[in-house]
Regions:
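Beta-strand-rich domains and repeat architectures in extracellular enzymes and scaffolds
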Residues: 78-79
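Bacterial N-terminal signal peptides that target proteins for export
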Residues: 1-11
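Bacterial N-terminal signal peptides
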Residues: 9-19
Length: 193
């Protein structure tokens, strides 16, 4: 008797499922297309700081000739490093209230008070060897005339970067085009206006 009841319950369930499928089916010719237009997908956005709403990471520069880098996000934390060069490019890698965690060209990281940073874009000339000089051209082309040769560590103002390999820079006594890959302070393929 028990087996008969189970078989009956299973039969009822199978019949109900089949009836549901048949009820949803429509005769040929009466089927309606249910294609919906594809939803537009926004391109991925870079992460933004929880305080500023600006992209993180991003490059900025030091606003003052004396900037303390702390080991934590408050003046009560020990000073890790003292920068003495206004205009030095640094990378903001995190935000906490009025403090920004930065990284310098040598990879040193720490916290700086936000008002000691500027949105002015600068780049530091990089070279493989200390005596290596980086050519500055009169146009964005390796075949252009070399107007100057810049030493490693020279800081230049980024006026514009094409995002295609070249930046127009200015500094004390020079202006011209330099390969974007020879500057620390701008991302590869980043466009700067």
């Amino acid at each position: 008797m028990r087996h008969v009841r189970r078989a009956l319950v299973v039969t009822i369930l199978v019949a109900a499922a089949a009836a549901a499928v048949v009820a949803q089916a429509q005769p040929l010719g009466q089927q309606q297309a249910s294609l919906q237009p594809a939803k537009e997908v926004a391109p991925p956005q870079p992460p933004v700081g929880s305080v500023s709403g600006l992209p993180v990471p991003r490059f900025v520069s030091l606003k003052s000739d004396k900037v303390n880098m702390h080991i934590g996000p408050a003046k009560t934390y020990d000073v890790k490093w003292l920068y003495q060069r206004a205009g030095l490019p640094v990378e903001i890698i995190a935000e906490f209230e009025t403090w920004r965690r930065i990284r310098d060209a040598e990879g040193t990281e720490g916290w700086v008070y936000h008002s000691l940073l500027s949105g002015r874009r600068t780049g530091m000339v990089t070279a493989k060897a200390a005596d290596d000089l980086v050519p500055l051209y009169d146009k964005p082309d390796d075949k252009g005339a070399v107007t100057a040769r810049l030493e490693r560590g020279v800081v230049a103002n980024l006026k514009r970067c094409s995002g295609e390999g070249w930046c127009f820079v200015t500094g004390r006594g020079f202006e011209g085009y330099v390969r974007q890959t020879r500057l620390w302070g701008v991302y590869p393929n980043e466009k700067v206006d």
